[in-house]
Amino acid sequence: MTVALEQAPQALHLRAWESAHLRVRGGTLWLTQDGKPDDLFLASGQQLLLLGPACYRLGALDRSGAELILQKN
């Protein structure tokens, strides 16, 4: 999955029993969770386990975009 700077943030909805493993392959990814005050910034090589129930918003921080691998469980 590739996220471009020009795109609106992409939504990722996880239900209560779902999780997703996110790994950034290139660029810098901006990530926020609806209802939470803190944003996260992940660089190439970093990974994160996302837990539901939640809605996450994903976006790129620079013109090169962000390339990521997302595996839902």
Predicted regions and their residues:
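Glycine- and acidic-residue-biased ligand/ion/polar-headgroup-sensing regions
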Residues: 17-29
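Conserved "cap/hinge" positions at secondary-structure junctions
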Residues: 16, 33-34, 52, 60
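Structured catalytic cores of enzymes that bind and process phosphorylated ligands/cofactors
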Residues: 46-47, 71
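Conserved short histidine dyad/triad with adjacent acidic residue
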Residues: 1-16, 42, 49
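Short beta-strand segments in beta-sandwich/barrel cores
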Residues: 28-31, 47
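Ligand-binding loop in jelly-roll beta-barrel domains
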Residues: 52-73
